[in-house]
From Swiss-Prot:
Keyword Nucleus annotated: yes
Keyword Coiled coil recorded: yes
GO biological process: cell division; chromosome segregation
CDD domains given in the database record: RWD_Spc25
Family: Belongs to the SPC25 family.
Record function comment: Acts as a component of the essential kinetochore-associated NDC80 complex, which is required for chromosome segregation and spindle checkpoint activity.
Protein name: Probable kinetochore protein SPC25
Source organism superkingdom: Eukaryota
GO cellular component, one term: nucleus
Species annotation: Eremothecium gossypii (strain ATCC 10895 / CBS 109.51 / FGSC 9923 / NRRL Y-1056)
């Protein structure tokens, strides 16, 4: 490649990185807003759950007191049947209220679980959009012979072509898992040292710089391929 061609490629890469960085920033801002809204909803649900717990504790105390009163009433013949019936009716009312509160608590727990699952799905969708749906990725595909496909709902598969002057069919590849705990590189071909993979994952997770990550892992894969050829 001539110096002019290299300068043009470098300018394209820098411009692409800037646009991707801006896009990732926008997506990160959207995720922060989503997380803030989710935290508010979760906090409301937790407050409601706490109130239900307090009411259940109060009911438990009242039920215990009623049991003692009923037991005492049964032992004392001077108490009237009307008073005993009143205690029994109050106990039934408290039991019905307890049943309703337990039902409400179960619904709140289910609602919280659905909210958390929805948030996780949205986070994974945004991650996939960052790396696959961005139209700028097509430019990067042409520059580095990159091919991207969604092998599973929670992962993306990357393949680099044009990695060997001696073998036009040679390619390097890896799979990037998009889990809730962050990015995880899997199934690298050729294999890379575990420590190197963890460094790449940490860099991507902390910076969000996809172009820099792709350049770094491509260089590592090409070096590993060259080492295999020399062995």
């Amino acid at each position: 490649m001539s110096l002019e061609g290299f300068a043009e490629l470098r300018a394209q890469m820098e411009a692409f990185q800037g646009r991707v960085h801006g896009h990732l920033g926008q997506q990160r801002h959207a995720m922060e807003q989503l997380l803030a809204a989710h935290r508010q909803e979760v906090e409301k649900l937790r407050l409601r759950t706490g109130a239900v717990q307090q009411q259940l504790a109060r009911l438990a105390g009242e039920e215990q007191e009623l049991r003692q009163n009923i037991s005492s009433l049964q032992e004392r013949t001077q108490h009237t049947t009307a008073q005993r019936d009143a205690y029994a009716a109050q106990r039934q009312k408290l039991a019905a209220e307890r049943t309703q509160l337990e039902h409400d608590r179960a619904e709140l727990h289910a609602m919280l679980a659905r909210k958390q699952a929805e948030l996780q799905r949205q986070r994974e969708a945004i991650k996939r959009q960052h790396m696959r749906d961005n139209p700028e990725v097509r430019v990067y595909e042409q520059l580095l012979g990159l091919y991207v496909r969604a092998s599973r709902p929670d992962s993306l598969e990357f393949a680099f072509r044009n990695v060997s002057e001696a073998d036009a069919r040679a390619e390097c590849s890896f799979t990037l898992d998009l889990g809730a705990d962050g990015y995880r590189v899997a199934a690298a071909q050729p294999p890379l040292p575990l420590e190197r993979l963890r460094d790449l994952e940490r860099d991507l997770g902390s910076s969000g710089d996809l172009p820099a990550f792709l350049k770094a892992i491509r260089a590592a894969l090409v070096t590993a391929m060259a080492g295999q050829a020399d062995a």
